[in-house]
A protein has these predicted regions:
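Extended, alpha-helix-rich binding/interface surfaces that flank or overlap catalytic cores
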Residues: 1-40, 47-137, 145-279
Length: 279
């Protein structure tokens, strides 16, 4: 059966959310929505009970080529030329669940200040560093405060609402090769894969793995490929040096923190209080 995205009229005529949406996700997810598509701004949605499909007025049915949950978001790709890609953001505001439906265009329109990224120093950013990390990054150039404590995965992380939102495992090129051969990196990446965002940063070049003196040529690159296929959501970044490894880690964690924070913001032109009562 081909998965379908359905837009229908909400049979509750007095509802402030006049549309019903069906997402072909798992057993099927129904939402009430403010509009039938996020054309110019993000659209507020709210969970809905499964309706009697035979009795509702269906506006359109479109085959979905992809409907995938990725952390707090659901990415929807429809099998048509226009109005093809959109995303549902599941978050909360003041303890109440809220859902935003957006396209790349409507997301940019809602937050125009984010269209052109600018280099800036994060003054109040706090990174968590694993207490077992020795000779770690200081991020001194970026005004970052470090909080030492035991991390269940990775060497550095950022926290949102008491939970780790992203983490980075740091490896020198020698430690990376050793952990590949003894299998410990496999377990580390399995733990990282359980987080919303994670990566492994290597202070060295990929080409140096081809010259490893204690293994046959190609053995370690083969292990890298196998791990990357096994854990595709945990990228392995070869940052060339310690300096660039620190720089990449800072930017990755800052972006992860900014992204998670942005997901908690209300729709432009509508307060979150208004959104949570529009159901």
């Amino acid at each position: 059966m081909i998965p379908e995205f359905i837009v229908a009229r909400n049979p509750q005529l007095d509802s402030a959310l006049p549309f019903l949406l069906h997402l072909p996700l798992e057993d099927g997810l129904w939402l009430k929505a403010k509009d039938s598509w996020p054309r110019s701004a993000r659209v507020y949605c709210h969970p809905a009970e499964r309706p009697d499909v035979e009795r509702i007025e269906v506006i359109e049915r479109v085959s979905a080529s992809a409907c995938v949950r990725r952390g707090p978001a659901v990415d929807l790709v429809l099998s048509r030329r226009v109005n093809k890609r959109s995303q549902f953001i599941f978050t909360s505001y003041r303890g109440r669940p809220i859902i935003f439906w957006q396209t790349p265009k409507s997301a940019a329109a809602s937050r125009p200040g984010l269209r052109v990224p600018r280099s800036r120093t994060v003054v109040s950013q706090i990174f968590i560093i694993d207490s077992r990390e020795r000779y770690g990054y200081t991020f001194s150039r970026h005004g970052v405060s470090l909080l030492r404590r035991v991390l269940s995965a990775g060497d550095y992380g950022v926290e949102i609402n008491g939970s780790i939102a992203a983490a980075v495992e740091r490896k020198s090129i020698a430690d990376f090769a050793t952990s590949l051969v003894d299998g410990s990196l496999n377990f580390a990446m399995a733990e990282l894969a359980s987080l919303p965002l994670a990566a492994v940063v290597v202070e060295g070049t990929y080409s140096s793995l081809l010259r490893h003196q204690y293994t046959r040529t190609g053995f370690i690159p083969d292990l890298v490929a196998r791990l990357q296929v096994r854990y595709p959501n945990v990228p392995i970044i070869f940052a060339e040096s310690r300096k660039f490894g620190e720089e990449w880690t800072f930017r990755f964690l800052r972006a992860a923190h900014t992204n998670a924070t942005d997901m908690q913001l209300p729709i432009a032109g509508q307060s979150a209080d208004e959104a949570t009562t529009a159901n």
